[in-house]
Amino acid sequence: MKKLFVLNGGAAVKPGNKSAFLKIDDPLSSFSRGGINTGDVLVYDAMLKALAYDQIKNLQFAHAGDEKLWPQEDYDATVIRGSNYLTETVDISNVIPLLKKLKGPIVPVGVGAQAAKYKKLELPKGSVEAWKIIADKCETIGVRGVYSAEVFNDIGIKNVRIIGCPSFYRNLRPSIEIRPIDPAKARVGLTLNRYLSADYASNATKTNRMQRALIQAVAQRPVNRLYSQGEREETLAIFAKGEEKQKHIQSILEKYNLDGDKDVEALVSDRMQAFFDVDEWAADAKENVDVLVGFRLHGNVIGLHQGIPAVFFTYDSRIRELSTLFAIPSVEVEDYMPINLENIFEKADFSKVQHVYRLNYAEYHRFLTENGLNHVLANPVTAPPKKALEKPNLVQTDQNLGEVTDWFQDEVGYMTGEIQTLRDRAWKLELALRELKAPKPNAKLAS
């Protein structure tokens, strides 16, 4: 019997050990406490599909300090589910005692760095120590792209292999065929990220304004749909009823300054979906969308691995790194231009994606094999790449001068209003502080 120990899997596993899902009986109760990133579940699901083990035990990083939860028997291998572990705020030092105790290989699959921009990261000392222990216990660490490899190199870890994210290979096939797009009639699937800040976006203002414009563009087609990737308000809006549902819908509209936009309200109210089972999520995308767009990494990958074309809107190192590695067409939010979906779909070049996928698949196959993991991947149809891609496949659209002028006039008007709002708030705060500092009349009498 082959046994696999998983660190930070983050989901339940179906019988047969090939599918992951979130076991949520009461979505309203669960999501009232906060959002749950279902993209992480997709990564775990893809790993399960690629690996072949009879017994699987998972332990989350958050509970790794509890020795009572440590495995009491030896496992053939340990894998770490890929995620954004390489940041200046994520400290995994609590996992060090467990890492030292575990026998056999410890193989991270799809580790990535996350920052607003490509830059040198100052990782927590505990994380550096943990990654060096892991590096000594595997042949190679699987990383998402060139930037993540550079971050490891900066802390002295050289044994890395650039594989992307395992979710891209969920279909287990050595090649994919991207479907053609009919720009005028394509059914569009959209994902959003409501919690972008300066820590995770090179320009949070541009990113959120671009999301607003994209929502409006997608909402204009009644066949289009919105996927919640575990966002709190979105998921609550799907499962709540009556006034409670309307309250969450209103919160979403206000977040993007779209209160009163009936098209967007209809999209959010009637055509928004959420899935806790990855198999069901993938099946819905396959049946109901022709192209995916948006601001969530795995919201696009759920289609891409099935041959459904997708266009990324890139705003941080993570999205830029992975879209570049697979030559996926992308719109850079820093360019900050008006959104015309038909124009984007017409200009998006997917000609490289199929070729690059075959190369990256071969690298993933080599990575799993060299680390001694028991896997079911078919043999590659080509050799791995000599060098990972580093140049993004940006969508170059033809902009109408009138549309661009109107766009920037509206944006300047919005920004001006926001500045005035901030000034008003600052003035009210100043008045309140003055009032607090002013001597009280009763105090003078008492003295």
Positions of predicted regions on the chain:
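Active-site anion-handling motifs in enzyme catalytic cores
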Residues: 1-447
